């Protein structure tokens, strides 16, 4: 099947084209709505690139240029030649709890729950509508970040607020990074030569946004992110878990509005708020130069991560493996070392030489004597979206 995967942002469209599960092209439309917009399409098979720089006013114009570049490259005759298009959607809300083919109801529901993800869902919706207009005969599939966590039990996803807030306003823990957690846990099963229904793993997706997921027999039973992607770990610019009483205190102290506090927690906090950097390469360079705030930021990040992983050891009946994925999880050997050292009493024994090796691809970095496997698995959310899209189209 010929599958296009779209990840539409407010001013960008990222895309990958798969032909029979093989990536043939990838690219980006950036700076939509600006005069110096740019479209890049790369032929993955021969590294040939095709580019256009021009004014792109909206997503529709951007996708039209992508179609032109597909034709110019010879990779795809036309968007109408696709078998399907998979769209990454951050939030499905309470009703869209599973990946699904797009119809009028799905469009309306994605729009309705945009209040939960105002920075993401409206852009995703624009991407779907643009694709429907550009290629009316092509099936569109909505792939929700929240869907993998639909198997969490109610006692894990509920907040201890008056029940009406859940019943009438859908306030509950949803979880995110679901596509990534699903992909790497499935790959872990292959790596360990087990069926995923027999495997219990803890997946740590560590990037500028970060979350941990407890996966029992292939299903999410708990995760660190909640109603929004702000809850949980200390992140690049997000604070993670916080005493809620701090918010009105800060509001009175600084005279900040709810919107300003929201911006503070999402964009000015995390490791960035502590030391002024959110790139871990910069943080570790600063630590080497004696920057105490950088050291504190890294220690806070790792400590919170250890607490969550440790708590999921308690949640799972048995833990077979810990998975590190995402930009930090895949590339930062120091973070992996600091986390695993603090978890040694739970049966985790890291092989320090394997951990330090700069190797891309899936690998096991635990010592042979370790009771729990430690895996580094590069995530591939686009491949997972393409797989699910193909599966749903095949069923229908």
From Swiss-Prot:
Q: Which GO terms describe its biological process?
A: acetate metabolic process; acetyl-CoA biosynthetic process
Q: Where is the catalytic site? A: 145 (proton donor/acceptor)
Superkingdom of the organism of origin: Bacteria
* Function statement: Catalyzes the formation of acetyl phosphate from acetate and ATP. Can also catalyze the reverse reaction.
- Binding positions for ATP per the UniProt entry: 14, 205-209, 279-281, 327-331
What's one Pfam family here?
A: Acetate_kinase
Cofactor: binding comment:
Mg(2+). Can also accept Mn(2+).
Sites where the protein binds substrate: 88
- Work out whether the entry's keyword set contains Transferase: yes
Its keywords, alphabetically, are: ATP-binding, Cytoplasm, Kinase, Magnesium, Metal-binding, Nucleotide-binding, Transferase
Q: What is this protein called?
A: Acetate kinase
Cofactor names from the entry are: Mg(2+); Mn(2+)
Source organism of the structure: Campylobacter jejuni subsp. jejuni serotype O:23/36 (strain 81-176)
Q: Which GO terms describe its cellular component?
A: cytoplasm
């Amino acid at each position: 099947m010929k599958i296009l995967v779209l990840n539409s942002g407010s001013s960008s469209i990222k895309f990958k084209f798969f032909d029979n599960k093989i990536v043939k092209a990838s690219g980006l439309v950036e700076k939509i709505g600006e005069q110096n917009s740019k479209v890049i399409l790369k032929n993955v098979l021969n590294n040939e690139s095709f580019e256009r720089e021009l004014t792109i006013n909206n997503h529709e114009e951007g996708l039209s240029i992508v179609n032109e570049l597909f034709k110019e490259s010879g990779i795809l005759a036309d968007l109408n030649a696709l078998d399907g298009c998979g769209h990454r959607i951050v939030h499905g809300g309470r009703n869209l709890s599973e990946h699904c083919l797009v119809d009028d109801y799905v469009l309306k529901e994605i729009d309705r729950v945009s209040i939960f993800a105002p920075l993401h869902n409206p852009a995703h919706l624009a991407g779907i509508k643009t694709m429907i207009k550009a290629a009316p005969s092509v099936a569109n599939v909505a792939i929700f970040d929240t869907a993998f966590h639909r198997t969490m039990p109610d006692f894990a996803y509920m907040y201890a607020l008056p029940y009406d807030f859940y019943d009438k306003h859908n306030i509950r823990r949803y979880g995110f990074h679901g596509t990534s957690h699903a992909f790497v846990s499935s790959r872990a099963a292959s790596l360990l030569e087990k069926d995923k229904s027999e495997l219990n793993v803890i997946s740590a997706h560590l990037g500028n946004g970060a979350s941990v997921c407890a996966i029992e027999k292939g299903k999410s039973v708990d995760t660190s992110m909640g109603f929004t992607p702000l809850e949980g770990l200390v992140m690049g610019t997000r604070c993670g878990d916080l005493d809620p009483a701090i918010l009105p205190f800060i509001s009175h102290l600084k005279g900040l509005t709810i919107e300003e506090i929201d911006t503070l927690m999402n964009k000015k906090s995390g490791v960035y708020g502590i030391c002024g950097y959110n790139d871990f390469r910069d943080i570790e360079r600063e630590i080497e130069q004696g920057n105490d705030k950088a050291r504190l930021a890294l220690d806070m990040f790792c400590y919170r991560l250890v607490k969550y992983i440790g708590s999921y050891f308690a949640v799972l009946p048995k833990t077979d493996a810990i998975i590190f994925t995402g930009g930090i999880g895949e590339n930062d050997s120091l973070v992996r070392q600091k986390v695993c050292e603090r978890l040694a009493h739970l049966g985790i024994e890291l092989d320090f030489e394997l951990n330090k090796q700069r190797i891309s691809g899936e690998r096991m970095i635990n010592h042979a004597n370790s009771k729990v496997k430690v895996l580094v698995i590069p995530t591939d959310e686009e491949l997972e979206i393409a797989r699910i899209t193909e599966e749903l189209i095949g069923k229908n």
